[in-house]
Amino acid sequence: MKKNSSDFCFSNERKAQLSEFLENLSIDFNNFDLLNTALSHSSYSNELDQKSDNNERLEFLGDSVLNLIITDHLYKTYPNKSEGELSKARSYIVSEDSLSSIAREIDLGSYILLGRGEESNDGRNKKGILADAIEAFVGAIYLDSGFLIATEFVVGLFDMYIRLMFNRGDFKDYKSLLQEYVQKKYKISPNYKLDKEIGPDHDKVFCVELYVGEKFISNGKGKSKKEAEMRAAEVALKAMEDINL
């Protein structure tokens, strides 16, 4: 459920919401003031007093932390990839499109504090706001728990996207591209439904169906639900212009 940023300041209610967010991600956090700042957009702080913090400084820090973690992970995990391939992969992973897509995956937008103007303009779904917030969140994790914990979080969140990129041989985020296309053309969002799981627990394959409205569009399979959704989105996007919804 979306949180109305004009309804509260940093109250017990807000702490409960932040606790819910952390629980969903299985993350421990010591400094809730720091976490709250990471999820406070400048439009929100501007509506309060000048002493109120926003996430711009944490975004600045998190951008560098995120780049280092991704660079280190790519270098160590893909020793046979060239410098050019690694640079291209890193640029894609830390792009606004990728960061905003990952932010949507963890429902980050629901916990961002926004000013009334951004709230009314669907700021929770804006790529720039989501990408900035996830950078600020990474910066906050780094300050709160150190580089190792920040690395574990980032790698756990991003590794599937990196593996998909190299496996497909391209650097497109089909879920984000499909969502933009469908929202622009039909004013709704695509819906992914888990159809079935095949195989033993140690080698499970997930089968996902993709719908636009009530209409079935495509399906996809993968070693995780996210991978299956990405593959379903890829099929749908390539066929969408030929489908009469």
From Swiss-Prot:
The lineage of its organism: Bacteria, Pseudomonadati, Spirochaetota, Spirochaetia, Spirochaetales. The keyword Transcription regulation does not apply. Belongs to the ribonuclease III family. It catalyses: Endonucleolytic cleavage to 5'-phosphomonoester. It holds the Pfam family dsrm. Its cofactor is Mg(2+). InterPro entries: dsRBD_dom, RNase_III, RNase_III_dom, RNase_III_sf. It is an enzyme of class 3 (hydrolase). The gene is rnc. Mg(2+) binds at E59, D132, E135. Residues 18-146 form the RNase III domain. NCBIfam families: RNaseIII. It comes from the Bacteria. The active site is at D63, E135. The keyword Amino-acid biosynthesis does not apply. It is found in: Cytoplasm. Its main location: cytoplasm. Homodimer. GO terms for biological process: mRNA processing; regulation of gene expression; rRNA processing; tRNA processing. Residues 173-242 form the DRBM domain. Its EC number is 3.1.26.3. This is Ribonuclease 3. Keywords: Cytoplasm, Endonuclease, Hydrolase, Magnesium, Metal-binding, mRNA processing, Nuclease, RNA-binding, rRNA processing, rRNA-binding, tRNA processing. GO terms for cellular component: cytoplasm. Digests double-stranded RNA. Involved in the processing of primary rRNA transcript to yield the immediate precursors to the large and small rRNAs (23S and 16S). Processes some mRNAs, and tRNAs when they are encoded in the rRNA operon. Processes pre-crRNA and tracrRNA of type II CRISPR loci if present in the organism.
